Amino acid sequence: MAIKVELLGGLDLLFNKQKALSLSLSNLGSTKLGSLIDYMAQIIEKPSQKDLFILNGTVRPGIIVLVNDQDWELLEKEEYNLEEGDEVVFVSTLHGG
């Protein structure tokens, strides 16, 4: 079972400049959205930048998570069960200036 992940707002820079990924749910070990977040943190190109994506076991404040265009806050957050064909978008609202 595959899902699509998009990385917007500069998050692609943490993932070798990949703006979109296709991932197999079997690679995550669980169908929970929290497992996807853990997996994404593990594949960050530079481990020293992990804290730019994850904080205390979840995405850091300032990163919006959408599942099939719905805010994850409405979908049980980390407990949401991913399904075949789901599209998960991570959007960073944190910008320098």
From Swiss-Prot:
One of its GO terms (cellular component) is cytosol. Coiled coil: none annotated. C-terminal thiocarboxylation occurs in 2 steps, it is first acyl-adenylated (-COAMP) via the hesA/moeB/thiF part of UBA4, then thiocarboxylated (-COSH) via the rhodanese domain of UBA4. InterPro entries: Beta-grasp_dom_sf, Mopterin_synth/thiamin_S_b, Urm1. The modification 1-thioglycine is found at residue 97. The keyword Cytoplasm applies. Its main location: cytoplasm. There is a cross-link at residue 97 (Glycyl lysine isopeptide (Gly-Lys) (interchain with K-? in acceptor proteins)). Keywords: Cytoplasm, Isopeptide bond, tRNA processing, Ubl conjugation pathway. It is found in: Cytoplasm. GO terms for molecular function: protein tag activity. Pathway: tRNA modification; 5-methoxycarbonylmethyl-2-thiouridine-tRNA biosynthesis. Acts as a sulfur carrier required for 2-thiolation of mcm(5)S(2)U at tRNA wobble positions of cytosolic tRNA(Lys), tRNA(Glu) and tRNA(Gln). Serves as sulfur donor in tRNA 2-thiolation reaction by being thiocarboxylated (-COSH) at its C-terminus by the MOCS3 homolog UBA4. The sulfur is then transferred to tRNA to form 2-thiolation of mcm(5)S(2)U. Prior mcm(5) tRNA modification by the elongator complex is required for 2-thiolation. Also acts as a ubiquitin-like protein (UBL) that is covalently conjugated via an isopeptide bond to lysine residues of target proteins such as AHP1. Belongs to the URM1 family. HAMAP family: Urm1. This is Ubiquitin-related modifier 1. It comes from Schizosaccharomyces pombe (strain 972 / ATCC 24843) (Fission yeast).
